Amino acid sequence: MIPLPVAAANSNSNSNSNSNDEESPNLSTVIKPPLKKTKTLLPPPSSSSSNRPLHLRVSIDNNNNNNAPPPPADFSDHQWNYPSFLGTTTRKRRPSSVKPPSTSNLRFDTIPKTKTKTKTNTNTNTNTNTNTNTNTDLPPPPVPSSSPVARPQHHNHRSPPIFYLLIITCIIFVPYSSYLQYKLAKLEDHKLHLCRQSQIHFSSGHGNGKISIPIHDASFSYILSRKAALYIVLFTLILPFLLYKYLDYLPQIINFLRRTHNNKEDVPLKKRIAYMLDVFFSIYPYAKLLALLFATLFLIGFGGLALYAVTGGSLAEALWHSWTYVADSGNHAETQGTGQRVVSVSISSGGMLIFAMMLGLVSDAISEKVDSLRKGKCEVIERNHILILGWSDKLGSLLKQLAIANKSVGGGVIVVLAEKEKEEMEMDITKLEFDFMGTSVICRSGSPLILADLKKVSVSKARAIIVLASDENADQSDARALRVVLSLTGVKEGLRGHVVVEMSDLDNEPLVKLVGGELIETVVAHDVIGRLMIQCALQPGLAQIWEDILGFENAEFYIKRWPELDGLSFKDILISFPDAIPCGVKVAADGGKIVINPDDSYVMRDGDEVLVIAEDDDTYSPGSLPEVLKGFFPRIPDAPKYPEKILFCGWRRDIDDMIMVLEAFLAPGSELWMFNEVPEKEREKKLAAGGLDVFGLENIKLVHREGNAVIRRHLESLPLETFDSILILADESVEDSVAHSDSRSLATLLLIRDIQSRRLPYKDTKSTSLRLSGFSHNSWIREMQQASDKSIIISEILDSRTRNLVSVSRISDYVLSNELVSMALAMVAEDKQINRVLEELFAEQGNEMCIKPAEFYLFDQEELCFYDIMIRGRARQEIIIGYRLANQERAIINPSEKLVARKWSLGDVFVVIASGD
């Protein structure tokens, strides 16, 4: 009988009696003893041995020796949860370092327990202590394994259904293939047996010779090779699925074989392989083609091996049949046998898949190439072309002028690089509905700030580069132009042509020239238009003349060297060109300085070039000197300037520069009325920020009025009938698009005209200081005054399509700002030297283009040729370049028949280049 363990918790006599009572009951009557799970805490290291709890011991030899040594204190308390006859506990055991028990004694030690509280309450808790001692847990049987390592947790990984399907397929087909191999071996044995029975006997000279065909060894080796092929095919079929499922365990297996421990967290092998494939297909352009080639070769080899395993032919024959099945899926129709048909159908299916992949690759390659061409990503291989960087509203008129300039050479090539889609750019150019006359326009999508995109359009081989201003504000646009110039200077191959940069602010021009050097030519668009509007306000009709000179449709400026003119004075050179009009000289001795309207005594030297106005660069040449008649002509001095009253409707960014130009042109006592929606205090701040000293103006007086120019009530508050000139500016403070700006200007123009016509009875109150300086008989001024009730109205028009509305109504002289700027850019792109000519003619100092009446040069109905009038103009230090008859609408610049005499009237006017000093 095995005694139950007794816990000696106390040293009193009750513990002994309880211990004796526990040994008396019969074990057969005990079904399930009361159990009590106890938890014991490890004593602190500093506790003495006297405070340690007593430990229980079970002796196998039924020896109740109370003097036995105490068991070790490292036994787990969970082993006392159940008696030994109830089986082991289901609770997870803690790792233990206890050695296996010996055959003599078996000891179960618990973790040292803390003292119970029954020691302090002996009298009151006697029953509690008794029950506690009686219901002490029984130890379980010893643990079979003494390993301290915890049992690994098994994770239930569910395999994919296709893996089980593959296993079932292999289980079915492997016995079947073995059966076929067995049957084939029997047939081979039967065949060998028949061959041995039909041995061939040959008779020779000394006896009978018997030669048998050694078929057995060959048949055996043939069967083995087919078996090996079959096993290779089956293994190859199973291998991808095995790799897919267990590929991530491969590094662990390798580490185990190498006896190394890699505790670092690493990316799974499947993800790493997928990443490498992704990188391979992304970096190398021919990766897809190589993958398709590898798949084709693998299918041919694998299919040939499978055919060799199920057919009786050779391996070479099987590979050839495999290729035919891949190339043509219909070749397997004549196959015989189940195995051969299954393999041939599989190979044909793979061939169809490879063919579909090949079609996809070819289609993708063609689509990618077409998209590249459509999106403008391919390189432009051109020479001597004009490159335009950027996109703006001026591009249409710029392309038109460049196409007209290239007409004489049979056309050219213009390349546009902008940050827009190629299809969108081509669509916008198509909407221009303009005949480019043999000039090709190539659009490319890209950024002018990127060197790769600049090289894509052959920037180093272009004969001229035009940088357009963006639609942003002035500072941002000029900053972007500066970055583009820096990108152009960074081209390693260098630039062959010059760079024309459209600037928005005159203050930023020196910085761009400093960065670009001698290759940079700047055109300050806003400044040019502002000065031109001032000149047109003072001299109506001048806008049409500038439009004819700047455009390539009529006469324009050219500079050329003529050695046969060396030694001649400028007075003789002036009448030496039948088809051109000399305007100046490029002095070689002065560093190539261009002198406009030089003295008559200037003599041409070696290296000097002549500046002329001609139809084209190849339509003029010097001829013999004609005989001209200077004669007697009236010497009328220029009339003194009178004070004028001018109205500005709208606000421009460079309005401070326009005021300074008016200060230089107008007589003292003039008034400038400014009518716009900008508050008066803000106007003063903007004018001061632009460098204008309002209190330092001597000739003009500023009058501020605030209002909306398209509201009739606001316009009626102005004395519109008293102004000499009215300038309608493209109001940048209100509108930001070309169409809206022109609509606003046109509405303001119509309202002013209607208000002036209603105030017609009060027109006598108008100032009598109408411009009389040489224009008392000017038909243009008279027509403009009659059309707009004695006020000259100048409208700034951005869109050329709006010009027709203004010109047909004959209510205003217009200024095409965008088109004139485009003409200037095109002219400077063709010849950068012309930029210095335009800068001087647009400036308030130096020579200028103006309109003079005929009474300065001739008498009424006097018959003279154009050369005679040119000689008379030299007496006033002027160069006459054209005229407008009284009965005509447009002026004629550089007339063709200069020696033909005709009668002139005092209603005619002449276009001259004169000094403004």
Curated annotation (Swiss-Prot):
Gene Ontology terms: cellular component: nuclear membrane
Composition bias, Low complexity: 7-19, 119-136
Transmembrane segments: 160-180, 230-250, 290-310, 342-362
Membrane topology: Multi-pass membrane protein
Subcellular location field: Nucleus membrane
Region of interest: Disordered: 1-154
Tissue expression per record: Mainly expressed in nodules. Also detected in infected and uninfected roots, leaves, seed pods, and flower buds.
Sections of the chain in a coiled coil: 413-435
UniProt keywords, alphabetically: Coiled coil, Ion channel, Ion transport, Membrane, Nucleus, Transmembrane, Transmembrane helix, Transport
Family annotation (InterPro entries): CASTOR/POLLUX/SYM8-like, CASTOR/POLLUX/SYM8_dom, NAD(P)-bd_dom_sf, RCK_N
Listed Polar residues bias regions: 78-89
Any one GO BP annotation for this protein: monoatomic ion transmembrane transport
A Pfam family this chain is assigned to: Castor_Poll_mid
Main function: Ion channel with permeability for potassium. Involved in perinuclear calcium spiking but not in cytosolic calcium influx. Required for early signal transduction events leading to endosymbiosis. Acts early in a signal transduction chain leading from the perception of Nod factor to the activation of calcium spiking. Also involved in fungal entry into root epidermal cells during the establishment of the arbuscular mycorrhizal symbiosis.
Subunit structure: Homooligomer.
Stated family: Belongs to the castor/pollux (TC 1.A.1.23) family.
Official protein name in the record: Ion channel POLLUX
Highest classification ranks of the organism: Eukaryota, Viridiplantae, Streptophyta, Embryophyta, Tracheophyta
Gene that this sequence comes from: POLLUX
